[in-house]
């Protein structure tokens, strides 16, 4: 029931992003609406087929062999077999920042990437918990969902940026937005898109925590990993570069130095304390 509700909520939020594109596009007249829809469809298709390549390239990840990482291969193979799913490709990112992510459009085309930092930071039990979380993202099609959400939000930003090029002093009779419409587009469009995208991202992280812990049968292992990652990502954050920001929402922990106040409210990840509390509660129910 919980997963069905979560899936429905995600579908509604994605529908909200798509509707927002159409509403903003309609301010530019029929031509603007057509362009907005075509751009949305094209961006979705591109995100669907290339999300894995884009994320792995952003992290400069390389394929890793079983000879290089036998323990990693063993735990991924065991969990994939237990879930009756194909084994994903495995990659290592050459960065000290501790993190991991999964990417790919479906289980047969998925990849799991661990940074060198997370391999050193976590023990085998904790790393197994992280792998369970990432595999759950794959099995729940969260990579596709987050890629589509990010693509739709990018389209909205494209339309907002385009709005700056439109003269605002004309009337609505010439099939263009008036001053009030332009202000609404530029002020409310990005905010609404961001709020919806964050709601999707946080919802999927909670679900991956729960289903990943269920897959490994060890919620406390993931809770322990999250504690270490919370401290580790603060000490060794990724630099805030555009190429890395495109992949940040896929990672198990916020890879950048945490902000304060409003910036913290707009994080792509749920609060670590809340995630850990949910896992500990889940472990209590299993006892």
From Swiss-Prot:
Q: Which GO terms describe its molecular function?
A: metalloendopeptidase activity; zinc ion binding
Primary localisation category: membrane
Q: What is its EC number?
A: 3.4.24.-
Q: Which residues cross the membrane?
A: 7-29, 33-50, 148-168, 180-200
Which Pfam families does the entry mention? Peptidase_M48 (PF01435)
Catalytic residues in the record: 134
* Gene3D superfamilies the record matches: Metalloproteases ('zincins'), catalytic domain (3.30.2010.10)
Tell me its cofactors: Zn(2+)
Q: Which InterPro entries match?
A: HtpX_protease, Pept_M48_protease_HtpX, Peptidase_M48
Q: How does the protein associate with the membrane?
A: Multi-pass membrane protein
Instruction: Give the subcellular location.
Output: Cell membrane
Sites binding Zn(2+) sit at: 133, 137, 205
GO cellular component annotations of the record: plasma membrane
Q: What processes does the entry annotate via GO biological process terms?
A: proteolysis
Keywords carried by this UniProt record? Cell membrane, Hydrolase, Membrane, Metal-binding, Metalloprotease, Protease, Transmembrane, Transmembrane helix, Zinc
Paste the cofactor note: Binds 1 zinc ion per subunit.
Q: Which HAMAP family match?
A: Pept_M48_protease_HtpX
Q: Give the similarity note.
A: Belongs to the peptidase M48B family.
Q: What is this protein called?
A: Protease HtpX homolog 2
Give the organism the record lists. Streptomyces coelicolor (strain ATCC BAA-471 / A3(2) / M145)
| Gene from which the chain derives | htpX2
């Amino acid at each position: 029931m919980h997963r069905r509700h979560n899936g429905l909520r995600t579908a509604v939020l994605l529908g909200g992003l798509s509707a927002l594109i159409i509403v903003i596009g309609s301010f530019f007249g029929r031509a603007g609406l057509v362009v907005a829809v075509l751009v949305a469809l094209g961006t979705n298709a591109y995100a669907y087929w290339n999300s894995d390549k884009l994320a792995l390239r952003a992290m400069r990840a390389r394929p890793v062999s079983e000879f290089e990482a036998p323990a990693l291969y063993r735990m991924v193979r065991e969990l994939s077999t237990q879930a009756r799913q194909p084994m994903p490709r495995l990659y290592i990112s050459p960065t000290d920042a501790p993190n991991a992510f999964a990417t790919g459009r479906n289980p047969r085309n998925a990849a799991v990437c661990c940074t060198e930092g997370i391999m050193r930071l976590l023990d085998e039990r904790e790393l197994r918990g992280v792998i369970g979380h990432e595999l759950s993202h794959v099995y729940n099609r969260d990579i596709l969902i987050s890629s589509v959400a990010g693509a739709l939000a990018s389209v909205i930003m494209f339309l907002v940026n385009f709005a700056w090029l439109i003269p605002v002093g004309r009337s609505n009779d010439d099939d263009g937005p008036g001053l009030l419409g332009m202000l609404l587009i530029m002020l409310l469009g990005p905010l609404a898109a961001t709020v919806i995208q964050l709601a999707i991202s946080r919802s999927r992280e909670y679900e991956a925590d729960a289903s990943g812990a269920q897959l490994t049968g060890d919620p406390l292992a993931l809770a322990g990993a999250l504690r270490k990652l919370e401290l580790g990502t603060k000490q060794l954050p990724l630099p805030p570069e555009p190429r890395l920001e495109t992949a940040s929402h896929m990672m198990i922990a916020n890879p950048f130095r945490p902000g304060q106040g409003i910036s913290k409210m707009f994080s792509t990840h749920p609060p670590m304390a809340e995630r850990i509390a949910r896992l500990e509660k889940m472990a209590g129910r299993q006892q």
